[in-house]
Amino acid sequence: MSYASEVKKELTSLEVHEKNAKAELMALIRMNGAIGINNRQLTLNTQTENPAIARRIYSLLKEFYHLEAELSVRRKMKLKKNNLYIVRLRTGVKELLNDLSILKDDFQINEKVPEGLLTEESELRSYLRGAFLASGSVNNPETSRYHLEIYSLYESHNQMIADWINKYNLNARTTERRSGYIVYLKEAEHIADFLQLIGATNSMLKFEDVRIMRDMRNSVNRLVNCETANLNKVANASMKQINNIQFIDETVGLGELPPKLREVAEARLIHREVSLKELGELVPGGPISKSGINHRLRKINQYAEKLRA
């Protein structure tokens, strides 16, 4: 089961009060429902690839609207051949759609929730939960870049969802996608907060655990890379020093160096892998500070370059 499926499974197990059930259904049916006419009667088909969501819709209709829907399943034949679960309602459709403010009196669809309809925070959260169940997705935090999105057919509805999410300072952004629009979150902290907001507490905790481990691994990797780079830098500098000292020795002899440079050159040939600080403590005339050792080694390098010129 994917992480997104785990989140949705948790959400479909939540108990809700009547007003919140209405808000959740308002999103589920507005975003996944299709109105039809059969024998001069309105019908409503709500489709999903997730059986838990289909059961959720069926249960909410029965418990809070006392409507008996039909559950059916068929196999999609295009692209991914997943099962498609259909919740079909043949009676009470117009009354339901009117109560959910989805259908206007002239049988036009309300593209978004009318202003002032959902006034309580619990209702807003429930609508966002329904919207995520209907057409939301979230990447697995273990294997992917952080990303959560909700798809909407209508731009006005998409912007409404973004505005509601941003009431909680989650930096939701919008963009056009295929034949519709999406609102999305990219920051890990905001995704975790959104999961908590819609009631997916266990999924949020799992997300946070994975995020913390990823951040720790990334920090360790950065430290290791930095340390490796520093070691390589030191090793390369040491090799250059040794090559120059050997060149001087083979060309004119180390005795041609001033005494202070000669003692550092001889110490470096003997102690090739030590740091500058350690080398300063090993020089016979020492101890010499790290900056002092570095200064003398630069002089030795310059002497070698003059010999090569």
Swiss-Prot record:
Listed GO MF terms: DNA binding
InterPro entries, A to Z: Homing_endonucl, Sporu_reg_WhiA_N_dom, Sporulation_regulator_WhiA, Sporulation_regulator_WhiA_C, WhiA_LAGLIDADG_dom
Gene Ontology terms: biological process: cell division; regulation of sporulation
Residues in the DNA-binding region annotation: 275-309
Keywords: Cell cycle, Cell division, DNA-binding
Function description: Involved in cell division and chromosome segregation.
Family of the protein in this entry: Belongs to the WhiA family.
Protein name according to UniProt: Probable cell division protein WhiA
Source organism per UniProt: Pediococcus pentosaceus (strain ATCC 25745 / CCUG 21536 / LMG 10740 / 183-1w)
Gene: whiA
